[in-house]
């Protein structure tokens, strides 16, 4: 569903007037609303249908938990051929936990029946929301943990907060056949931001199925720093004044139209849906060319975020986070702040998310859509005549919050027919506490405290790490029959009588397998991927195609 900007927004009256005039839907959808498109997310009542069907089949009790409940997408060809007003068959897919057992279920929502119920073996589902906080009571009562805290001068555990996280899997005997959590603790006394108050060098290994403490690993006492890292307004004081406010307004309302989860802007049309694990999914992207809506892309979304930390200590070597696959409990995305995360004139999509018990809950402002004019130039040439075209984009944005990191993801639709995916990482760097105060206080003969990171505050080191963002992109350029090409720049030596000596040419190769399509970004061997239609050519005889152009790496 979509929601209007916050009622304190000075643009509200004008926006609502424009919405009424242009028949935009600006109010939240009712819980009972039925799907208007085959790829619409599950609605409130559909989640309840899932629960009722599982209960009727004898697969639901007080201990049943859900790692995932989502739309089970219909057949791709059926989606492309669907027309508004046609009937829609709805199904759901669920990952269900019952004690140590995990099951995959397919539920026919339209007919209220269970289609399949399959036990998974040798696999671990996503973590549940409750698991991150579970095990703390057993840990704080364990004698080895109490002794380790006493060695640090801490005898009152009242304000010690502990959290369990999934460690990287290394196939150790301890990990095999178990759902393991590593528990880390911090001193929350008198602070909001506890990232700088961690109990350094102390890790507790817990069996998440029954809460059993398997071992307590103490790598040495590190005093809890007194360094504060609060970021609330009261702690930071008066912010830097910014002269000359900039206002962007759309007195006639947005330049795009919404019909449920379908968006139309200039020549673009597409479907957007929130998704609890992936954040959002962009589907059925078409571009209007004259009197034809030409297919460009069937579906695209984030598929995974991999964040490995580069510290060999026990407390850190296992921090190889699979963010979307392990940490998306309760929904990968979190609400966007109107007027700050998105401009005042943005329109929002709400979402319904299943909790650990499978029951639906409302999540407002999960996706925003807005037009962006940043003063950039789309195209220009100064000749006769002088010509320039201002740039105007349509942005579809979500924000993921995973522990200390906040990620912003933009799908940007451009007027020139291109689509750009932008990723931004912000939030708080994950840090460890160290004995040394800074880079100048290294003990003689010992390993530097910042050997695997950088000091960011006294006794605080931000640990080196990577962020790998993986996206699933299913292009259907002028239809589903496409070739995956690699265009490589090859140097060609010219005859000796040519003063140029050499030029480069483009060598086009069709990749027939994933191994053939693999490519390392190497500026000494330039190449790009391209997806080309098998059946459609452009006005000069080339096959219509889209390039996949990776951005910068290693920043």
Positions of PLM-derived features:
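Bacterial N-terminal signal peptides
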Residues: 17-28
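Bacterial N-terminal signal peptides that target proteins for export
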Residues: 9-17
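Short, Lys/Arg-enriched N-terminal segments with co-localized hydrophobic residues
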Residues: 1-10
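Short, non-transmembrane alpha-helical segments in secretory-pathway proteins
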Residues: 38-80, 128-171
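Extended effector regions of multi-domain proteins
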Residues: 112, 118-127, 152, 189-280, ...
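Boundary at the C-terminal end of the N-terminal hydrophobic targeting segment
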Residues: 30-34
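Exposed beta-strand-loop-beta-strand "reactive/processing" segments of non-cytosolic proteins
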Residues: 61-110, 156-207, 266, 396
């Amino acid at each position: 569903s979509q929601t209007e900007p916050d009622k304190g927004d000075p643009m509200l009256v004008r926006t609502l007037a424009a919405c009424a005039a242009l028949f935009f839907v600006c109010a939240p959808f009712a819980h009972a609303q039925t799907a208007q498109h085959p790829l619409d997310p599950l609605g409130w009542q559909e989640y309840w249908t899932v629960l009722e069907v599982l209960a009727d089949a004898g697969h639901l009790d007080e201990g049943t938990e859900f790692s995932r409940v989502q739309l089970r997408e219909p057949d791709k060809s059926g989606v492309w051929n669907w027309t508004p007003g046609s009937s829609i068959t709805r199904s759901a897919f669920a990952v269900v936990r019952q004690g140590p057992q995990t099951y995959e279920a397919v539920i026919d929502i339209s007919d209220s029946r269970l289609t399949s119920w399959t036990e998974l073996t040798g696999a671990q589902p996503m973590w549940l929301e409750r698991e991150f906080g579970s095990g703390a009571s057993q840990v704080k009562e364990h004698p080895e943990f109490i002794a380790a805290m006493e060695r640090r001068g801490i005898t009152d555990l009242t304000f010690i907060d502990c959290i369990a996280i999934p460690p990287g899997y290394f196939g150790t005997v301890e990990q095999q056949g178990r759902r393991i959590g590593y528990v880390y603790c911090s001193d929350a006394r008198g602070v909001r931001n506890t990232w700088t108050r961690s109990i350094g060098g102390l890790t507790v290994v817990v069996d998440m199925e029954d809460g059993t403490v398997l071992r307590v690993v103490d790598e040495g006492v590190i005093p809890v720093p007194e360094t504060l890292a609060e970021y609330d307004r009261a702690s930071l004081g008066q912010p830097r004044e910014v002269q000359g406010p900039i206002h962007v307004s759309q007195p006639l309302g947005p330049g795009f139209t919404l019909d449920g989860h379908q968006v139309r802007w200039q020549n673009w049309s597409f479907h957007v849906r929130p998704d609890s694990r992936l954040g959002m999914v962009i589907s059925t992207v078409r571009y209007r060319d004259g009197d034809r809506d030409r297919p460009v892309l069937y579906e695209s979304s984030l598929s995974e975020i991999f964040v490995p930390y580069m510290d060999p200590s026990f407390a850190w070597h296992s921090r190889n986070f699979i963010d979307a696959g392990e940490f998306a409990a309760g929904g990968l995305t979190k609400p966007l702040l109107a007027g700050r995360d998105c401009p005042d004139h943005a329109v929002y999509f709400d979402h319904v998310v299943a909790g650990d018990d499978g029951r639906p809950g409302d999540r407002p402002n999960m996706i925003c859509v807005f037009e962006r004019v940043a003063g950039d130039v789309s195209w220009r040439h100064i000749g006769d005549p002088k010509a320039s075209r201002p740039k105007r984009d349509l942005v579809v944005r979500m924000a993921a919050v995973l522990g200390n990191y906040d990620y912003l993801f933009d799908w940007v639709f451009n007027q020139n027919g291109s689509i750009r995916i932008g990723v931004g990482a912000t939030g708080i760097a994950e840090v460890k506490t160290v004995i040394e105060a800074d880079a100048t206080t290294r003990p003689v003969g010992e390993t530097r405290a910042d050997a695997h990171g950088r000091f960011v505050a006294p006794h605080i080191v931000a640990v080196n790490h990577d962020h790998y963002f993986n996206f699933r992109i299913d292009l259907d350029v002028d239809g589903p029959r496409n070739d995956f090409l690699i265009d490589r720049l090859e140097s060609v030596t010219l005859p000796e009588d040519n003063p140029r000596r050499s030029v480069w040419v483009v060598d086009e190769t069709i990749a027939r397998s994933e191994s053939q399509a693999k490519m390392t970004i190497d500026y000494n061997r330039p190449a790009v991927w391209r997806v080309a239609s098998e059946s459609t050519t452009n006005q000069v005889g080339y096959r219509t195609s889209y390039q996949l152009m990776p951005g910068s790496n290693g920043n």
